[in-house]
Amino acid sequence: MKKTKILLVSMTALLLASCGTKKAVIQQKPVQDNKVAQQTAPAPKDNKMESLVVMQRVADNALYQKNLVSNLTFTLNDGHKDITVPGILRMRKDEVIRLQLLIPILRSEVGRIEFAKDYVLFIDRIHKQYVKASYDEVGFLRDNGINFYSLQSLFWNQVFIPRQQKVSEADLSQFAVDESKAQAEGSTLISLKDGKMDYKWSVNPKSNQIVLTTVTYNSNTHGASKLSWSYDDFKAFGSKL
C-alpha cells in the first residue's frame, strides 16, 4: 500500500425421467444402467474442501518481503477532537513494527509507537516521557488477545490464530468460511472463535484480499469491546497486490 491510514451457491437438482415402452396393455420398466447413472448424477458438494480452497487463496496473498516502509496518516481522538499528524510506518517481519509520528512540514519525530515480540514502547518526545511494557500489561491488547504476531498479521493483511506465530496449511481447517453473502454484499466471511474472542475477516472474493478484520472480546464484567481494522486502495508490491 502506498499510504496507510490508521483509525483508533445454490445448486439445482437434475431430474432424470425415463419412459417405458408400451406394448398392448403391458408396460415395461426400463432397466437403469447404474454405471451411466453414476456418471450423470451431480457430485455432492464438499463444503469443507471449498472452505480450504478459499483459505488457501487468502493465505497465498501473504507478502514475502522482509522489510516494509510506508508514509502514514495517524489520527487520534482525545475525547474532544481529532488530532491528525503525518508519520512513517517501518516494519521488519517477525521483529518489529514502528510508527513514527512527525511534526507537519518539519517532519521531526514527536512520538513513537513500537511493537516488538516481547514489549510495547510508547515515546512522547514533547513531554519527554516514555512507557515500555509487556503485552500482558497493556489492558486493551491483553483483553483482546492481541500479541506481536496478531498485530503483525493485522498490518500485513493476513489471518491469524491467537498465541501462534504463524498459520500453517494444517491450521487452515480451523477457520469457518461463509460464502453465502459473497454475491449480495461482495465479501466472503471468514471466522474463528477462541474462548471469549471472536475473530472475523471480510474478504473480497475476486482478489482474495482481506478488506476488514474485526476482533471482538466478550467480557462478563465489561461487556463487548471491538477492534476494527479496514483496508483499501491496494497497490502492487513486487509480484503481489
Residue spans for each PLM region:
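Gly/Pro-enriched, hydrophobic low-complexity segments
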Residues: 21-25, 164-241
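C-terminal motif of bacterial Sec signal peptides marking the signal peptidase cleavage site
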Residues: 15-18
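An acidic-aromatic
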Residues: 96-149
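N-terminal leader/targeting segments and the immediate start of mature chains
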Residues: 20-81
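Bacterial N-terminal signal peptides that target proteins for export
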Residues: 1-8
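Solvent-exposed loop/turn segments connecting transmembrane beta-strands
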Residues: 78-82, 102-110, 195-197, 221-224
